[in-house]
Amino acid sequence: MGNGDSVVAQKRLARFRPDERPAVEGTFDRLHGARSSASAGKTSKGLSLDMLQLTMGKMASESMIKRVFQGLHSIDPGVPLHPGDGVSREQLLIFLADVLRGTAEERAPLVLAMAEGAKATVTTTEQIRGFMEDLVYAAVQTLAHKGHLRAWHPERMGDGAQGVKLLAEQLTSELKPSDQNSCDIACLEDWLFRIPMMAMFLELLIGEGLGVVLPSRPPPTLLPPCQFAPWTDLRCVLSLPLLMFLSPLLPEGHSAPWRMLFSTKMHGESFTRLLGSCKSRGPTVLLVKDTKGYIFGGFSSQSWEVKPQFQGDSRCFLFSVFPYMRVFTCTGYNDHYMYLNQGQQTMPNGLGMGGQHGYFGLWLDYDFGHGHSRARPRCTTYGSPQLSADEDFKLDTLEVWGVGKLPEEQEEDEKKKSILDADLEVQAMMEMTGKTLHSQGLREPEEDED
């Protein structure tokens, strides 16, 4: 940057590595030049709303692009601004630094400006929710436009528009307004600090939308990879926004590959077929839709096994999707995480999660097609309310997705590891006593090693 540029902008630029700074500094001229070449009309010295729309139009709605423009305009660059000149070079650089490399304290004023306006000091949860709907929609569109779908096919998946609204409402529900419905800067700072997904959405939209490519930091990963799904024949309940919501909650996060194991739409309504598809297949996500449109499910952290005892561990959870998106983790009250039984006369036969016999948080009867969610006032295991529209529900659709590696793959990975890798203290002691580590450096590298 030149000597005449603001001290504030120069400090922000220092956050980027030397090899990244040309990409950041060149963004202004590139955006300005794109508009100049696309139109023979007179252009301002700064960036205009039209310039942003030309660049981001395929990844964000018109209202979201206006919000970004408001955020840019809200920045004090530390140098005089000329009214009518548009967004200055310094404002853009500070904006990029705060979104791509900033803290919750620096991002909070930008979120406030994008939700309420450049001069705002406070906003409402309703305004934040509207902003979030625009932002989540933009994230989904950006993933599709930039080819970051990781083998998912949105056109064969659940209602994406509904999912955007549900995820936006869920994220907004995490706000802790100081007043009944009022959010100030401190409230937004706390929210951004607690909800890392917010920063990822912003980073994805601004980095990809404005074409800022940073070698040291690829675009945020918001989706897990889809390892297998019969897309030609499939129309699933799972949606991209639901994947964005669920995958960070899993033990392996976004790295866990998903594969379809069972769907009533493809495999029919058969409890025996369900067992055959899911037993001993590793961790799974169950997704249930009842005949009244409610969508809910659960995550099982271990393979399903047929036995009269409860199974699983505290990593299991229940969740709701529609009419609201929420997660319900274990309370510690009991260990009734998972249950699967068949062919017993004295024990319940079916699949359940949480609660107790006859009063599960989620229950699918072996006589396929119906179940219950008897959790009034709350499920003892997960603290979840009634998940279905009615306590006893009829099943419309059931999907089961395997998440993570298969048990045999996990076992094979563990066998590959040297005992010295598993116990670094033993390795250190051998080196201290002069023992030669003959196998060191001789094993074939792992597939995922550089």
UniProtKB/Swiss-Prot annotation:
Disulfide feature: none
Pfam entry (one): TLD
Main location: membrane
GO biological process: one example: regulation of cell migration
Domain TLDc: 236-404
InterPro entries membership: TLDc_dom
Coiled coil: none
Gene Ontology CC: one annotated term: lysosomal membrane
Keyword vocabulary terms for this entry: Cytoplasm, Lysosome, Membrane
Region entry Disordered, spans: 430-450
Taxonomy, superkingdom: Eukaryota
Compartments, record wording: Membrane; Cytoplasm; Lysosome
UniProt function note: Activates an alternative mTOR signaling to regulate cell proliferation and migration.
Protein name: MTOR-associated protein MEAK7
Organism encoding this protein: Danio rerio
Name of the encoding gene: meak7
